[in-house]
Amino acid sequence: MTTATTQPAAKPTETLASYTPPKKDAKVIQQAEDDDAVAPDATGIGKMRWPVRGRVISNFGGGKDGVDIAVPEGTPVKAAENGVVIYAGDGLKEFGNTVLVRHENGLVTVYGHASSIEVQRGQKVKRGQEIALSGMSGTTDSPKLHFEVRKNSAPVDPSGYLE
């Protein structure tokens, strides 16, 4: 009977630098809104569409800057109106993977807690176009979409803008 012997693992010849994650920027929304990217023309429909179909589990107000909508993880998140992506990344710790879209009327919509982002900064998007997949990134204990509407950088109640 023969016995197989294993060779010790080879030792690396050089040391890799340790990974340093990018710094989180507390002013991501403000900086993105200051970007001068031009949004495409609005659809003219008047009201924005809901970015997902789900159950609203948290409403605007009382310290909440938007609404939280419960949806299964991986649900397509769609642009509420034509616009241009002014931010797509994970620099907002509480929201994790987040997309910000500026619209022709100056409003900015925020889509947080995505499991993946399907667009990039500077990209023009159409109403109803998939921009992300819902998830649990950031600080959340269940899959959802955090959705905000901002006017002049200040959060406003999304219900007045949605059809």
Q: Where in the sequence are the language-model features?
A:
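A residue-level detector for short acidic-glycine micro-motifs
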Residues: S58, V71, Y87, H113-S116, ...
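Solvent-exposed coil/turn segments that connect beta secondary-structure elements
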Residues: G61-G63, P72-G74, N82, D90-G91, ...
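Short aromatic-glycine-enriched beta-strand elements
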Residues: K93-L100, P143-L145
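Conserved, short, structured surface segments that act as functional micro-motifs
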Residues: Q123-E163
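Surface-exposed, glycine-biased beta-strand/turn segments
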Residues: T2-F95
